[in-house]
């Protein structure tokens, strides 16, 4: 009976992030693309400013990396979120499954692991599909800061 209950319980509810396989870890990503938007850091304060400028490798329509398996070859500054460095990424969105599970919170109802597709996530406007712009179209990066500091107003 206990084995049946264990198998009926989704892995993200019965395993810690450290206990997950690499495939389980990867499947937690909802594919919103928020990690793939460029961030700017104030050199004086280390404050991070979020932009709507997409990485060149991000397919804005699908919110997927064009070269995910080889992304570091194409974008040396691309981040790799791991179990070890997760605490360092305080800027992760409040909706991020990695962040939520690390904080002991449940996955949102629109998460692809619960719904079986990304449609609900896109419908809730969690993905960057509706706000992202191509890096090649950007002239002044300050015009694309989403959380503008007072000096940029």
Swiss-Prot record:
Gene coding for it: ycgN
InterPro entries per UniProt: Puta_zinc/iron-chelating_dom, UCP006173
Record-linked NCBIfam families: PRK05170.1-1 (NF003498), PRK05170.1-5 (NF003501), PRK05170.2-1 (NF003503), PRK05170.2-5 (NF003507)
PANTHER family: UPF0260 PROTEIN YCGN (PTHR37421:SF1)
Pfam families named among the record's database cross-references: CxxCxxCC
Name of the protein in its database record: UPF0260 protein YcgN
Family: Belongs to the UPF0260 family.
């Amino acid at each position: 009976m206990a084995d049946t209950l264990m198998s009926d319980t989704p892995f993200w509810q019965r395993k810690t992030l450290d206990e997950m396989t690499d495939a389980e870890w990867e499947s937690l990503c909802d594919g919103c693309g928020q990690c793939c938007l460029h961030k700017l850091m104030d050199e004086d304060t280390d404050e991070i400013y979020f932009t709507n400028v997409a990485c060149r490798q991000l397919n804005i329509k699908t919110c997927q990396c064009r070269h995910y398996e080889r992304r570091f070859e194409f974008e040396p500054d691309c981040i790799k979120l791991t179990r070890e460095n997760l605490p360092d990424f305080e800027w992760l969105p409040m909706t991020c499954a990695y962040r939520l599970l690390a904080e002991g919170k449940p996955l949102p109802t629109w998460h692809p692991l619960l719904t079986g597709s990304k449609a609900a996530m896109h419908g809730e406007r969690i993905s960057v599909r509706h706000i992202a712009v191509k890096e090649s179209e950007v002239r002044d990066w300050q015009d694309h800061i989403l959380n503008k500091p007072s000096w940029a107003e």
